[in-house]
UniProtKB/Swiss-Prot annotation:
SUPFAM superfamilies listed in its UniProt record: Aspartate/ornithine carbamoyltransferase
Residues annotated for L-aspartate binding in this entry: K84, R169, R221
Pfam assignment, any one: OTCace_N
GO terms assigned for molecular function: amino acid binding; aspartate carbamoyltransferase activity
Gene3D superfamilies membership: Aspartate/ornithine carbamoyltransferase
Lineage per the UniProt record: Bacteria, Bacillati, Bacillota, Bacilli, Lactobacillales
Binding annotation for carbamoyl phosphate: R56, T57, R106, H136, Q139, A262, P263
Gene for this chain: pyrB
Pathway stated in the Swiss-Prot or TrEMBL entry: Pyrimidine metabolism; UMP biosynthesis via de novo pathway; (S)-dihydroorotate from bicarbonate: step 2/3
Assigned keywords, A-Z: Pyrimidine biosynthesis, Transferase
Subunit structure comment from the entry: Heterododecamer (2C3:3R2) of six catalytic PyrB chains organized as two trimers (C3), and six regulatory PyrI chains organized as three dimers (R2).
HAMAP family for the chain: Asp_carb_tr
Protein name: Aspartate carbamoyltransferase catalytic subunit
InterPro entries attached to this UniProt entry: Asp/Orn_carbamoyltranf_P-bd (IPR006132), Asp/Orn_carbamoylTrfase (IPR006130), Asp/Orn_carbamoylTrfase_sf (IPR036901), Asp_carbamoyltransf (IPR002082), Asp_carbamoyltransf_Asp/Orn-bd (IPR006131)
Organism: Streptococcus pneumoniae serotype 2 (strain D39 / NCTC 7466)
């Protein structure tokens, strides 16, 4: 069993993945996009547990599982024993005892997965579909796949991440891996939403200072549900100060691309008519989410088979 397989018993944080593992997942995602197939004759079982709302992550994991021919065990939080007070640990312990091979989990608690992967009793592999404002590895990997398809490399690329930085698991996951891959990072958005941890990975700027220099302009959703009611800007003020207006779009380099993890607050982070503009890769990101999640599932299942 290779070191790479051993490390991918779980995929919970970009910090836990080596650059080599990341590149293998990206390239495997591209292979799946180009038509590669893998038949699973032993019918591994995957359960998706989403304790927070999701469309893209939840449904693209489901499509990835269907394309791989995996067995899906539906889990509805609303009708489960969670509503009787059952803990997440006991829920996963139960699914593990039932023979579920992989659990894809989104949960509001940061680092929820640490207790699960440390348990000697839980044998199910964990894929983190997002933990509060912590990590979102599969989103980061699909973003990387989209950038790699465009440029063929990461070294030397100027990447700006703009918006609700503090509350964004996407920003944290991407900044950690992009710095290791050799990209130059810039962070823009309201000063109230910039924690000092970002300074270790890049430079704080205003969007107008950097918009005409970057190769990748990545906007983040304003996460109203994670803010105190008094902390939210008006939509109009936010868009004027920090969003992608037509004037800012026109200043982007000829080769620059526009990204957003979605869902998008139209006319807040990005002007409505620019969401599908020629430089936008937002739809491509969604498409790539299926294929990179196929690669993640394949790698985790390969590790289980090797054990």
């Amino acid at each position: 069993m290779s070191e790479n397989q051993q490390a991918l018993n779980h995929v919970v944080s970009m910090e836990d993945l080596t650059v080599d593992q990341v590149m293998k997942l990206i390239k495997r995602g591209i292979e799946f996009k180009n038509g590669a197939q893998i038949p699973y004759e032993d019918h591994p079982i995957v359960s998706n547990l989403f304790f927070e709302d999701s469309t893209r992550t939840h449904k693209s994991f489901e499509v990835a599982e269907i394309k791989l021919g995996l067995e899906r065990l539906d889990f509805d939080v609303k009708t489960s024993s969670v509503n009787k007070g059952e803990t997440l640990y006991d829920t996963i312990l139960t699914l593990s005892a039932l023979g579920v091979d992989v659990c894809v989990i989104r949960h509001p608690e940061v680092d929820y997965y640490r207790e699960l992967i440390a348990s000697p009793t839980i044998t199910t592999s964990i894929i983190n579909g997002g933990d509060g404002s912590g990590q979102h590895p599969s989103q980061s990997l699909l973003d990387l796949m989209t950038i790699y398809e465009e440029f063929g490399h990461f070294e030397g690329l100027k990447v700006a991440i703009a918006g609700d930085l503090d509350h964004s698991r996407v920003a944290k996951s991407n900044m950690q891996i992009l710095k290791r891959l050799g990209s130059e990072l810039f962070f823009a958005g309201p000063e109230e939403w910039r924690s000092q941890e970002f300074a270790d990975y890049g430079k704080f700027v205003t969007i107008d200072e950097i918009i005409d220099q970057v190769d990748v302009m990545m906007f983040l959703r304003v996460q109203h549900e994670r803010h105190d009611s008094g902390a939210v800007f008006s939509k109009e003020d936010y868009h004027a100060q920090h969003g992608l207006t037509q004037e800012r779009y026109d200043r982007l380099k000829e080769t620059a691309i526009l990204m957003h993890p979605a869902p998008i607050n139209r006319d807040v982070e990005i002007a409505d008519h620019l969401v599908e503009a020629p430089k936008s890769r937002i739809v491509q990101q969604m498409t790539n989410g299926v294929f990179v999640r196929m690669a993640i599932l394949e790698s985790v299942l390969a590790s289980r088979n090797a054990n």
